[in-house]
Amino acid sequence: MIKILIPTAKEMKVCQNIAWPKLSAQTKIIIDYFSTLTVSDLEDIYRINTSAARCEAQRWQDFKAKQLTLNPAIKLFNGLMYRNIKRHNLSTSEAQFMENSVFITSALYGIIPAMTLISPHRLDFNTKIKINNNSLKVFWRENYDTFMQSDDIMVSLLSNEFETVFSPKERQKLIHLNFIEDRDGQLKTHSTISKKARGKCLTAMMENNCQTLEHLKQLRFDGFCYDNELSDSKQLTFVKKQT
């Protein structure tokens, strides 16, 4: 079976309020840490102004008191990649694929199924803090590496920020997808192309219940198709011809 790893996003869209689920021990440690920080501390950590820091301080207090809203993670994040993922009006098979094959990598929750209920938060792996005397990447490394202990095919739609949480040994198991536009023979890529294409690709995988790499290579989405010459066993490249 294929498992697809996607990152969180800075943009979020809060949509509902549901009873709180049980939190992992690691998540509780991070919440406890942030709930002790002052507004001034948060200004320095987030590099934001006092007004924004006050809002973050209140959010962490509400987090600790379990007074924040909860949303399915795949619907909470609203960055460019997420806006290009089909997230509403899913068929039964699409919902099953989303539940069983799509996982979100988080600096607060670890690796979670895409439909897990979570709260809005401001935290990524570039945040300069120490938890138990470790960076967030080191703090989560064992948890992330444990996720890789299966025979499933691990497809990465992650940025370097998230991939480097894994130890080098486990990182080697990831299958990367690259998205390139061919403009009159000139191959080009940039973050906007990649983020949109990741969302479109994930949608195509879900709609077609893609469970093997061979099936993935056959998919067509938003003008992209697999290019064997630009690919290898660990890097699958999809090219979109622009006229």
From Swiss-Prot:
GO CC annotation terms, alphabetical: cytosol
Disulfide bonds: none
Entry-linked InterPro entries: YaaA
Pfam families, per the entry: H2O2_YaaD
Example GO BP: response to hydroperoxide
Family of the protein in this entry: Belongs to the UPF0246 family.
Name of this protein: UPF0246 protein SAG2081
Organism: Streptococcus agalactiae serotype V (strain ATCC BAA-611 / 2603 V/R)
